[in-house]
Amino acid sequence: MSKRDYYEVLGVGRDASEREIKKAYKRLAMKFHPDRNPGDKAAEASFKEVKEAYEILTDANKKAAYDQFGHAGVDPNRGGGGGYGGAGDFGDIFGDVFGDIFGGGRRGGGQRQAARGSDLRYNLELSLEEAVKGLTKELRIPTLASCDVCDGSGAKKGTSATTCTTCHGQGQVQMRQGFFTVQQPCPTCHGRGKIIKDPCAKCHGDGRVEKTKTLSVKIPAGVDTGDRIRLAGEGEAGEFGAPAGDLYVQVSVREHAIFVRDGNNLYCEVPISFSKAALGGEIEVPTLDGKVSLKIPAETQTGRMFRLRGKGVKSVRSHAVGDLLCKVVMETPVNLNERQKELLREFEATLTGESKKHSPKAEGFFDGVKKFFQDLNS
């Protein structure tokens, strides 16, 4: 009997995407799966047909051969084509799509792979100076390391683990529950796939031991709160020789007494005297590289921002350097003696009648207030 067209089997068009093909396969495989149709030979045949169509149409090379030559292009008994090897066992492809729903994973597959080591996270707090300039930090990391007595095998020196005879190295066993077959960790080997008859005395068969290791970690200049540094292979050791996990260093930067950071720019407030603001002059302002001089123009108002280019932070991701922005805040003099108070009174008296000239903002404000109340009463 001639085979049906694979696209027809799945109920999709020839221009169907891989996602549409997979969706159709899921629906039909669920419908015809033998675990849902026990003893139904027709359903079993339909499942094999659906599975075969899915295998061909989701393999780029086989699909191309099928689209060009039809079934002949994927017939292993013919000279050309993609060498398709038949429908095989139910579980091979079904497990890829449904996982453990029916316990149909790779029944004919290899032994369970040892698990990769867990990733670790280390929270590192830096001062602003450390974050901006970069440094090398010595970190002490509590972790699980490969046992140095058994070299991570978990078995006593001179012995080795044997394949579990219950699960045959799979690490899982199948249990039937009604119409369904589910997979559970093997109760004999506890999901490992191997049995250690003579465990290592140091690690007690685990292959790993608790250890605190010291790492020298280079922190690049310009890091900021939220940045993360990945150290490949510095996490926990894997099970029985499997690859180690990674270590992630999570950076946070403490608040600074003077500077506030925003991206690559730094901000600070610089107090200046009343006379300096009025007459102008030079003041010293702090930077992360030391003090620098800043020229204050005469008649500078409080809150004015001055930009010192290139005095900010060098970006950790580029060569760009931010700026330092200094906000001047005029400080009202306190603890005045009588002579100083008298001088200020004399100065205030000289401003009488000339407020618009000397304090235009204040005069404008009070004019606005006066007009506001006049409008209320009108």
From Swiss-Prot:
Its cofactor is Zn(2+). Its main location: cytoplasm. The keyword rRNA processing does not apply. Residues 5-70 form the J domain. GO terms for cellular component: cytoplasm. GO terms for molecular function: ATP binding; heat shock protein binding; unfolded protein binding; zinc ion binding. SMART domains: DnaJ. It comes from the Bacteria. One of its GO terms (biological process) is protein refolding. Binds 2 Zn(2+) ions per monomer. Keywords: Chaperone, Cytoplasm, DNA replication, Metal-binding, Repeat, Stress response, Zinc, Zinc-finger. It is found in: Cytoplasm. The keyword RNA-binding does not apply. Zn(2+) 2 binds at C164, C167, C186, C189. Gene3D superfamilies: DnaJ domain (1.10.287.110), Heat shock protein DnaJ, cysteine-rich domain (2.10.230.10), Urease metallochaperone UreE, N-terminal domain (2.60.260.20). SUPFAM superfamilies: Chaperone J-domain (SSF46565), DnaJ/Hsp40 cysteine-rich domain (SSF57938), HSP40/DnaJ peptide-binding domain (SSF49493). InterPro entries: DnaJ, DnaJ_C, DnaJ_domain, DnaJ_domain_CS, HSP40/DnaJ_pept-bd, HSP_DnaJ_Cys-rich_dom, HSP_DnaJ_Cys-rich_dom_sf, J_dom_sf. The J domain is necessary and sufficient to stimulate DnaK ATPase activity. Zinc center 1 plays an important role in the autonomous, DnaK-independent chaperone activity of DnaJ. Zinc center 2 is essential for interaction with DnaK and for DnaJ activity. Belongs to the DnaJ family. NCBIfam families: DnaJ_bact, PRK10767.1. Homodimer. This is Chaperone protein DnaJ.
